[in-house]
A protein has these predicted regions:
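Hydrophobic, small-residue-rich alpha-helical packing segments that form membrane-like cores
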Residues: 2-3
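N-terminal leader/propeptide and maturation segments of large enzyme subunits in energy/redox metabolism
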Residues: 33-54, 59
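Acidic, Ser/Thr-rich peripheral helices and adjacent loops at domain boundaries
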Residues: 12-26
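Aromatic-enriched
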Residues: 300-319
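Generic long, charged, amphipathic alpha-helical segments
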Residues: 349-373
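Conserved small/polar residues in nucleotide/adenosyl-binding loops
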Residues: 378-388
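Thiamine diphosphate
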Residues: 55-61, 66-292, 300
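Long hydrophobic segments that form regular secondary structure
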Residues: 87-90, 332-353
Length: 389
């Protein structure tokens, strides 16, 4: 059996042979001829066993062959002629076929070849240098998270960080360099990341699982069974929550609230700006001892004009930003910016507007809602999601 990576010309040669029409023509002709001979069935069976044993030594893909799935490859994914030949062969095979195509990420563009992770998802960039054209040098929410978790980890050695193959996107690169023994990249396996975090929490550590909202939904079962029902202290740092723009439709973070708010023992928070994200992360790690999620959007950590509003975070309590009469806008996270814009338009029409920073999406601050109801407000509650509780 092969242990290390296959090297040399033999695997390459056999891959070319198996991916050609002439190989399958010869195979069919020989097999049909042998079946016509006395004892042909036995001969064909012996040849198949010999072939299988040889393939296990020098060819990849045997897991699929053992399941009755034909395997073709590996094939150079940048060679169009070879790919066309392989696809023609695959059409001739009766049954399931796996075509193993090997590509080089960023192939043909040197900046992308040198830094494929950076070019996995990128906005506008200089095509000559490959440098991203940033609309602002101000820190993103991911940057704020990165700085704060490193700051807290310096003081508390029980803090560990987990990612599912996304240290760059989630801002954990710095943590991985500063605290390599407390950083865990589990690969593209969000389900395992959650259960792994649960195990560390059960052992007395303080795991922070940094993940994109759209990928967290893969781990719903583990969040429910392995973390929340067990009441374990796992912090979910949910990046790219809400609409993500240029990241594309597969990355839209609009479903996490729908399932997180339905799970028992789960607390969900959303910061109005970067400084509140820092405060929430500190609260979640140092002043809380149960499952908790902090969801924040893609991009720049907004300067909301509300920086002077920084009341200490108390569990389950909202923050009163502006208290007036007529209409109350209760908003969470980056929807505070929308609430401010709405307030300005309504003020032009003579309305007095109250703005409340919800902070905790779950649990809802019912005391605050009772306070607002006592003044006979018209209430509007704003989240960036498809549905919410």
């Amino acid at each position: 059996m092969s242990i290390a990576k296959n090297v040399g010309g033999v695997p390459h040669m056999l891959s070319n042979i198996r991916s050609s029409d002439s190989y399958y023509d010869l195979k069919e002709n020989v097999t049909n001829t042998l079946y016509k001979l006395p004892g042909g069935d036995h001969i064909v069976e012996r040849i198949k066993k010999t072939k299988s044993n040889l393939k296990q030594i020098i060819l990849p893909g045997q897991m699929f062959e053992c399941m009755g799935i034909s395997y073709l490859g590996p094939v150079n994914g940048h060679d169009i002629e070879k790919l066309i030949k392989v696809f023609h062969v695959a059409k001739r095979i009766n049954g399931a076929v796996i075509i193993h195509v090997v590509t080089h990420k960023g192939h043909g563009y040197k900046p992308a070849e040198r830094n494929p992770a950076k070019f996995h998802g990128i906005g506008p960039f200089d095509i000559v240098t490959g440098k991203e054209l940033k609309s602002s040098d101000k820190p993103t929410y991911s940057d704020v998270f990165s700085e704060k978790i490193c700051q807290l980890a310096k003081k508390d050695k029980s803090i560990v960080a987990v990612t599912a193959a996304m240290p760059d996107g989630t801002g954990l690169n710095k943590f991985s360099k500063w605290f390599p023994d407390r950083f865990f990249d589990v690969g593209i396996a969000e389900e395992h990341a959650v259960t792994f975090s649960a195990g560390m929490a059960a052992g007395g550590l303080k795991p922070v699982f940094a993940v994109y909202s759209s990928f967290l939904q893969r781990a719903y079962d583990q969040i429910l069974h392995d973390v929340c029902i067990q009441h374990l202290h796992v912090v979910f740092a949910i990046d790219r929550a809400g609409l993500v723009g240029s990241d594309g439709e597969t990355h839209q973070g609009i479903f996490d609230l729908s399932f997180l708010t339905s799970i028992p023992n789960m607390t969900v928070m959303a910061p109005k700006n970067g400084s509140e994200l820092s405060a929430m992360l500190e609260f979640a790690l140092l002043n809380f001892n149960s499952p908790i999620a902090i969801r924040y959007p893609r991009g720049q950590a907004y300067e909301t004009g509300l920086e002077e509003h920084n009341a200490p975070i108390r569990y389950g309590k909202a923050e009163m930003i502006i208290e007036e009469s007529d209409i109350a806008l209760v908003a969470a996270g980056n929807m505070l910016i929308t609430a401010q814009a709405v307030r300005e338009k309504l003020k032009e029409k003579g309305y007095n507007i109250t703005i409340v920073n919800e902070r905790f999406i779950k649990p809802v601050d019912t005391d605050m809602l009772d306070r607002l109801s006592a003044v006979s407000y018209t209430h509007l509650r704003a989240h960036e999601t498809l549905r919410h509780l």
